[in-house]
Amino acid sequence: MNGSRQYILAAGGTGGHMIPAHALAVELMRRGHHVALVTDERGTRFPELFKDVQIHQLPAGRLTGGVKGLFQAMRNIWAGRERALTLYENFTPAAVVGFGGYPALPALLAAFKAKIPTVIHEQNAVMGRTNRFLAGRVDAIATAYHQVDRLKKRYRRKTEVTGNPVRDEVLFLRDLPYPPLSDNSIFRILVVGGSQGASILSEVVPEGLGLLPLHLRRRLQVTQQCRPEDLEKTRAQYAKLGIPADISTYMADLPQRLGWSHLVISRAGASTIAELGVAGRPAILIPYPAAMDNHQYANARELVSAGGARLIDQRRFNPFELAKQIQKMALEPSALKNAAARARQVGYPDAVEKLADLVERVGGNLPQQNSIEEDSTFEKNQEGAVA
């Protein structure tokens, strides 16, 4: 599309919302557009992702906490809507793009009031609350998966499968081969627990790796993300087992570490699944059972069905089960390489381009293209989804 435009991205302040918003911001600016971000207080803690982007904090509210909590949430949402309307008078966006999370709600409500074109992007395989509420009124819906539970059938005509955008540093891994692996070479495992780590991984993974056969355990080199309170205990466990391990609470170079890894052990957040697919890395996934609408189980199903990952329910996640699954995947180097290739097949390396194309079309008032109304794969996969 010719001509520079302005776009507003609205996202909740967690990594699952902020990372795809960041990727789209970079792509839109690469195309010569101007971008502003609307988020909550949590979202302002990601300054490294939005160095060249205006960041505006809106009041928003969670629709919980009984009558009193609901009343306060509605007041905050209304205040956020009014503040967003003022922002739109000065910034004049061609479109407003919502990535879910409560801060996206007042931003999109203001866009409806101002008659600004709107797009929502759903990162998970289950439509989130905010996006479900907005889906009927937006101009277009972008999804990360063909099968999205709780996406109503009547919205298919305006829905496109774009995939989940990932950072440029992860896209770089797409063209790199799977790291060389033999029966005697170093076997690198990356353990990540989402944006804040996961204590259960710190409890189970070191002990599970310690149960592996000696000839396999001697080859291990571990990189693990931990919560701050688990850091020293986890380091001590690995030291006791004699397993080289780099333990930290935050990994600024996570894409590079992903590129070195032969196997990933992680939760099944949307960004993690997207990065595994783009990079082509096999994984053992432990979905977070308390995730809203159990969406991490749904996120994992495509990668698991393709043979790129194994899933362990958290109720069965113990050192013995982990050691068993690692041995099934790792005793033959060719098995891990095959799993990596299968993971790569379900990646969406062009997700950010597809999403940016959609946003430009909607922002330019151009006809919608490539909807999934007649997509037979989508039709088949949506059977059984909640309507």
Curated annotation (Swiss-Prot):
Superkingdom in the source lineage: Bacteria
Positions annotated to bind UDP-N-acetyl-alpha-D-glucosamine: T14, G15, G16, N124, R167, S195, Q296
InterPro entries in UniProt: GlcNAc_MurG, Glyco_trans_28_C, GlycoTrans_28_N
GO molecular function per UniProt: UDP-N-acetyl-D-glucosamine:N-acetylmuramoyl-L-alanyl-D-glutamyl-meso-2,6-diaminopimelyl-D-alanyl-D-alanine-diphosphoundecaprenol 4-beta-N-acetylglucosaminlytransferase activity; undecaprenyldiphospho-muramoylpentapeptide beta-N-acetylglucosaminyltransferase activity
Pathway entry: Cell wall biogenesis; peptidoglycan biosynthesis
Cellular-component GO terms for this entry: plasma membrane
Thylakoid is among the record's keywords: no
Residue ranges that the Swiss-Prot or TrEMBL entry lists as coiled coil: none
Keywords: Cell cycle, Cell division, Cell inner membrane, Cell membrane, Cell shape, Cell wall biogenesis/degradation, Glycosyltransferase, Membrane, Peptidoglycan synthesis, Transferase
NCBIfam families xrefs: murG
Similarity comment text for this entry: Belongs to the glycosyltransferase 28 family. MurG subfamily.
Biological role stated in the UniProt entry: Cell wall formation. Catalyzes the transfer of a GlcNAc subunit on undecaprenyl-pyrophosphoryl-MurNAc-pentapeptide (lipid intermediate I) to form undecaprenyl-pyrophosphoryl-MurNAc-(pentapeptide)GlcNAc (lipid intermediate II).
Name of the protein in question: UDP-N-acetylglucosamine--N-acetylmuramyl-(pentapeptide) pyrophosphoryl-undecaprenol N-acetylglucosamine transferase
The species this protein was found in: Zymomonas mobilis subsp. mobilis (strain ATCC 31821 / ZM4 / CP4)
